[in-house]
Structure formats: C-alpha cells, structure tokens
Regions:
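Non-transmembrane functional regions of envelope-associated proteins
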Residues: 1-145, 182-210
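Short, mixed-charge amphipathic alpha-helical segments
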Residues: 175-183
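Substrate-access "cap/lid" subdomains that shape
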Residues: 131-176
C-alpha cells in the first residue's frame, strides 16, 4: 500500500498532476495474502483523479509492429481517460539521451504520447495537437521532426529538480503531515519513480561527467 498512501497524500496536498514511473504487471492480490493491495491502489487512483501511469511499447514480430504493455486492467479502469503515457526512451548509438520521441502508434494504430507530454497535457488540462513539424499543448509549442522527435532542452544537470526519498514521503504520509505536502507539492508536477543509480531509467545525457 506504499504507493497508494503516497499518491493520496500528494494529491491531497494539492499536486496538479502525479506521474507514476512504475509499471505493475503482476496482480499483488495473488502474491500477498490478506489485504487486497490492488484494490487499495485502484481506490487511490480514483480518489486522486490526476495520476499519469506508464506503459511500454515493444516490438511484436507476430504483429509486425509495436504492442502496448499496459498497467493492470484494474489500475487502468481506475484512471481518468487519456492518462497513460509510454516510457520508452530515445537513446542514441553512443548510449546518450539527447532527444525524445513524443508520439508513437502501435500495430493497431492506437496513438500514445510520451509520459512527459501527458503530464504537461494534464497539468494545463489541454489536448495534444500535432501540425506539420510542431506539437502544441496549451501555449507550449514543441518543434519535432517527422518521427515526432524533439531535441531535449535540458534544464540542467542531475539535482536541478528537488528530490525527496520515497521512504521519507511515505513516513510523512503516515504521520498525516498535511503541511509538508501542501508546502512542497501544491500546484506542482510530481514524479514518483526509481532513484537507484542502477535503475534502467538512469542514462547519460550531455551533462554527464564520469
């Protein structure tokens, strides 16, 4: 129930959008006796109404196209419409991340937006529009190429955005420290994701120094 506790606390603190960079594929209620942990999580998603979850788009030889690997159906049904974004990174041949694909279609021609783009769309309560070589969300105009890729305008090196440990946030949620959540998360975009340097999410960028 850790994710559920944090989502509820951050949402009640006034966060405008919460991005959950974690893909749960195995039902927890089949793994853990006792409480219905999937149900607890689904209730938190329904209560918050502002959570973006990730999926992954994987090549499928049978389909000869991309296949969406989505969160558990129970989670998807609890989400608001259009609140899943793909987490596939665009990685250059040297292993660095300098650009990002923002839109992808699967083999059934379903259109998906990158999680970061979905977060912006949710934050501004605006639809994503594409015209020629531009994507528009609210008043944000994003230049893209024909593959819907943008060059990333990095805000700065690691540490540019505040990071708080998952465990600390959970402890504060358990304590009911509403003041902390309002002071730190009100009207903010909040990303919940792995912080371990060995995570697959950690990739070198032009700011990287060995």
């Amino acid at each position: 129930p850790y994710f559920a506790d944090i989502i509820k606390a951050v949402s009640r603190g006034g966060a405008k959008v919460i991005a959950l960079d974690f893909l749960q594929l195995i039902p927890l209620n089949k793994k853990i006796d006792g409480e219905d942990h999937d149900g607890i999580m689904a209730e938190a998603l329904m209560e918050a109404e502002n959570v973006i979850m990730i999926n992954l788009l994987r090549w499928d030889n049978t389909l000869q196209g991309l296949r969406a690997v989505n969160p558990l159906p129970r989670y998807r049904y609890a989400l608001e419409p259009n609140t899943i974004g793909f987490a596939n990174l665009s990685i250059d041949n040297d292993g660095y991340v300098r650009r990002q694909t923002l839109l992808l279609n699967d083999a059934q021609n379903n259109n998906y937006a990158y999680i970061g783009l979905q977060v912006i769309s949710k934050y501004f309560n605006s639809v994503i529009k594409k015209e020629k070589n531009e994507l528009t969300v609210n008043d944000c105009i994003i230049p893209v190429n024909r593959y819907s890729e943008m060059m990333i305008n990095f805000a700065g090196p690691s540490g540019t955005f505040p990071i708080v440990s998952f465990y600390k946030i959970w402890q504060l949620a358990q304590q009911g420290n509403t003041e902390f959540f309002e002071n730190n998360f009100k009207n903010k975009m909040v990303l919940i994701g792995p912080g371990n340097i060995y995570s697959q999410d950690f990739k070198p960028t032009p700011y990287y120094r060995s």
